[in-house]
Each structure stands twice: as structure tokens, then as C-alpha cells.
From Swiss-Prot:
<dbReference type="GO" id="GO:0003723">
    <property type="term" value="F:RNA binding"/>
</dbReference>
<feature type="domain" description="RRM">
    <location>
        <begin position="36"/>
        <end position="114"/>
    </location>
</feature>
<feature type="modified residue" description="Phosphoserine">
    <location>
        <position position="248"/>
    </location>
</feature>
<feature type="region of interest" description="Disordered">
    <location>
        <begin position="1"/>
        <end position="34"/>
    </location>
</feature>
<comment type="subunit">
    <text>Component of the spliceosome. Homodimer. Interacts with AFC2, CYP59, RS2Z33, RNU1 and SR45. The interaction with AFC2 depends on phosphorylation status.</text>
</comment>
<protein>
    <recommendedName>
        <fullName>Serine/arginine-rich SC35-like splicing factor SCL33</fullName>
    </recommendedName>
</protein>
<feature type="modified residue" description="Phosphoserine">
    <location>
        <position position="9"/>
    </location>
</feature>
<dbReference type="InterPro" id="IPR035979">
    <property type="entry name" value="RBD_domain_sf"/>
</dbReference>
<feature type="modified residue" description="Phosphoserine">
    <location>
        <position position="165"/>
    </location>
</feature>
<dbReference type="Pfam" id="PF00076">
    <property type="entry name" value="RRM_1"/>
</dbReference>
<feature type="modified residue" description="Phosphoserine">
    <location>
        <position position="175"/>
    </location>
</feature>
<keyword id="KW-0508">mRNA splicing</keyword>
<feature type="compositionally biased region" description="Basic residues">
    <location>
        <begin position="244"/>
        <end position="260"/>
    </location>
</feature>
<feature type="modified residue" description="Phosphoserine">
    <location>
        <position position="188"/>
    </location>
</feature>
<keyword id="KW-0963">Cytoplasm</keyword>
<keyword id="KW-0747">Spliceosome</keyword>
<feature type="modified residue" description="Phosphoserine">
    <location>
        <position position="20"/>
    </location>
</feature>
Length: 287
């Protein structure tokens, strides 16, 4: 039964055996895909390529060693790349050299993400990296530039905000005062309300506060300007001309028409009846 239970395994193993002829390294996978370059960190700035070559050639032939430097200053960055000919040698060197003391510093050795490239390509990377760094550094510059626009943004927001909201409230009474001057139509009153307008300007925020706090100041504040401003011109204009206009035509029309209508009627009646008698009496003695 055990022999029969293992019969299906050979086809599975056969598929695996079909992959086995491909070259493989010690740590599995194809040797072509395995990394051959190591990234060595925590190097001293005075470390040279010869120092790394002596310590890493113990594990196999070294193809290339590269110590990158800063593109702008030329100072070493404190790490380097060691590339081996065989990926197995690179794996042994990583295993033994990780934590190794070189020139008084403990090294950290890991596989590089990509195999070591030419120095020209690395320089191009450095330039590109510098650009990327500049781009990374530029956001603070943009932020610094954006520090100047915040007043703009603040202004746009402050129009609806609290900091710049009082000026428009102050401007409203200013716009109302000339309107009141227009309605009054008198320049003499336009100057005197200037003081009242200044009081009104001081009172306008109080009105806003009184509206939010209590309804009583509304009545006291709203009635005082209405009594002082509105009735004075209305009484002068409406009462005086109406009385003068209404009384004069009514008196002139009604009594005059009545006198004229009633006076000539008796005159005509008297003149018609006695005219004959008078003329007869006058004629009689004259003749």
C-alpha cells in the first residue's frame, strides 16, 4: 500500500527534475539571477579600494570595487560596492564579512539590489539622485515660497473669516451714511450726522453683539436713530406743505364758488323783476 501511495509522486518529482538541469547556485535559484555585488556600509572616509580588495579577495576573484563620492563636494559617502565573478563567492563574503572590523569600524554587508554597474552609469545615477534630492529639497523651498502666499490665502479666507470681517461691517455704515445724506438732501445735516455716523459706526458692532446677546438693546438702539433722523424731515416736509396746500385750495375754491354761485342768483332775480319797474319809474318822472 505504501508503494502504491508514492506512485503519484514521481510525476511531480519529474517536473522538478526537469528544472534541475538548469545551473543553480548554493542558495537556490539560477546562478544568472543571483546577485554578485555586495553593498558594504560604515566605511571610513579614508578607506581605499585596495583595503577592500585585500579583505574580500579571500573569498574569490573580485571583478570591481567602487567607492562612490559626492558629485558636488567629491567627499566619500561612507559606503562601497564589491562585485565578485561568482555569485557563490559573493554569498560567502557576505556571510563572513558582515560585522567584520575594517580600519576600526564594524562593516555591514548586504546584497546589492542590482549588480554593480559601470562608474559612468553610477555617475549618471548620482546626478539623477542629486536632482531627485533637489526635488526633495525643493518642496521646503516651495513651502518657503508658499509662506508668502499664506497672506493671500488668509486674505481670501479672511474675507469670510473673523479677522477681516469687521472692516466690511465698518464700511457698511459708511455706505449707509451717504445714503441717509441723499435721503435727507441737506448738506448741513450731512455734516452733523458725521458725528452721529461715527457714533453709528461705533454702535454697529454693538448691534451685532446685542443681536447675539439680548434683544433689548435692539429696541433702544433702533428707536433712537429712527426718531432723530426719520420724523424730523418727514414732519417738515409732509405736514407743512399738506396743510398749506390742502387748506388754501379748499378755502379758495369752496367759499369762492359758493359766494359767486349764490350772490349772482339774487342779483339776477332782483335785477330782472325791478328792472322793468325801475326803468318805468325812471322813465315816468324823466318824461
Amino acid at each position: 500500500m505504501r508503494g502504491r501511495s508514492y506512485t503519484p509522486s514521481p510525476p511531480r518529482g519529474y517536473g522538478r527534475r526537469g528544472r534541475s538541469p538548469s545551473p543553480r547556485g548554493r542558495y537556490g535559484g539560477r546562478s544568472r539571477d543571483l546577485p554578485t555585488s555586495l553593498l558594504v556600509r560604515n566605511l571610513r572616509h579614508d578607506c581605499r579600494q585596495e583595503d577592500l580588495r585585500k579583505s574580500f579577495e579571500q573569498f574569490g576573484p573580485v571583478k570591481d570595487i567602487y567607492l562612490p563620492r559626492d558629485y558636488y563636494t567629491g567627499d566619500p559617502r561612507g559606503f562601497g560596492f564589491v562585485q565578485f565573478m561568482d555569485p557563490a563567492d559573493a554569498a560567502d563574503a557576505k556571510h563572513h564579512m558582515d560585522g567584520y572590523l575594517l580600519l576600526g569600524r564594524e562593516l555591514t554587508v548586504v546584497f546589492a539590489e542590482e549588480n554593480r554597474k559601470k562608474p559612468t552609469e553610477m555617475r549618471a545615477r548620482e546626478r539623477g539622485g542629486g536632482r531627485f534630492r533637489d526635488r526633495r529639497r525643493t518642496p521646503p523651498r516651495y513651502y518657503s515660497r508658499s509662506r508668502s502666499p499664506p497672506p493671500r490665502r488668509g486674505r481670501s479666507r479672511s474675507r469670510s473669516g473673523d479677522y477681516y470681517s469687521p472692516p466690511p461691517r465698518r464700511h457698511h455704515p459708511r455706505s449707509i451714511s451717504p445714503r441717509e445724506e441723499r435721503y435727507d438732501g441737506r448738506r448741513s445735516y450731512s455734516r452733523s450726522p458725521a458725528s452721529d455716523g461715527s457714533r453709528g459706526r461705533s454702535l454697529t458692532p454693538v448691534r451685532g453683539k446685542s443681536r447675539s446677546l439680548s434683544p433689548s438693546p435692539r429696541r433702544s438702539i433702533s428707536r433712537s436713530p429712527r426718531r432723530s433722523r426719520s420724523p424730523s424731515p418727514k414732519r417738515n416736509r409732509s405736514v407743512s406743505p399738506r396743510r398749506s396746500i390742502s387748506r388754501s385750495p379748499r378755502r379758495s375754491r369752496s367759499p369762492r364758488r359758493s359766494r359767486r354761485s349764490y350772490t349772482p342768483e339774487p342779483a339776477r332775480s332782483r335785477s330782472q323783476s325791478p328792472h322793468g319797474g325801475q326803468y318805468d319809474e325812471d322813465r315816468s318822472p324823466s318824461q
